[in-house]
Structures are given as structure tokens and as C-alpha cells.
Amino acid sequence: MSKVAEELVEILAKRGESVTFAESCTAGLVAGAFCEVAGASKVFRGSVVSYANEVKRDFLGVSEEVLNGVGAVSRECVEAMAIGAAKAFRAQLAVSVSGVAGPSGGTPAKPVGCVFIAVFYNGQTRVVKCNFSGDRQAVRSQSVQTALQTALLVLNEN
């Protein structure tokens, strides 16, 4: 994990860019994993844990239509979360996560382990839908790994 975070820090520092995170089900674990890297402070602007829909709406700008329609665990929500975080923290790279970590809260359409991750960079957003298995800790751990790996993939493609 730290290897991926180290690469992210290195690339962002070389480019003179910064990163932010907007997290729901991971509750700050992605930012925490990123900041384990020495030198992360050069590129890390800050992050928000937006567990409550009101925070998603009021701080990150996720619309009521999204929250009341497709819901917080959706492609549309994580895309808006990432864009909102990039604006709020004035960061070039923004990563967002929202999902059902369990052990309860799942539905047939969005079972435990259903997690959406978005990476916003250069005006474009990549969203991935994951279906992780395991207990709450396993789902959250896999979410952190996938979020950082997806961010690195996006940076390497740009």
C-alpha cells in the first residue's frame, strides 16, 4: 500500500499539484494511508469525512436529486463528491469513496461490499464500482487500496 501512496506523492510533488479526499464508508482511511508517506504534507491539502448526506450536500455540493434519487452509494454521488472536494480544497486531484461496508445496510441492488470510487483530475472523473467481499474491515481495506491504485492509474495516464 505504501508503495502506491509513495508513487502518488512523488508524481504530485514533481508536477507541483495537490490532492484531497472525500470519504464516506472509509471514514478517513484513504487520507490516513496516503499521509503515512513521508513528504505527503507537500501535496496533501486536507480531506473531509462525509458520512452524513447533509455534509455531502452542504460541503461537497452533492445535489438533493442525487441523494434522494440514486442515493449516496452511486456513481453520481462519488463523482459529485470528488468534484466538490477538488473545489473546496483547491486540489488538482480528488479521490472520493462511498459504499456499504457492512455488516448491515446492504440491499439487493447495493449489497454489503458495494463501493463506488471516483478520481477527479484534469477536469475529468473516472468512477469505478467495486463489489468487495469479507467483513467490514476487509471491505474498507480493499476500498482504500483500490482508491489509491485508481488515483495512481489516472495520474499515470495523464
Feature names for model-found ranges:
Residues 1-158:
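Short alpha-helical segments enriched in small residues
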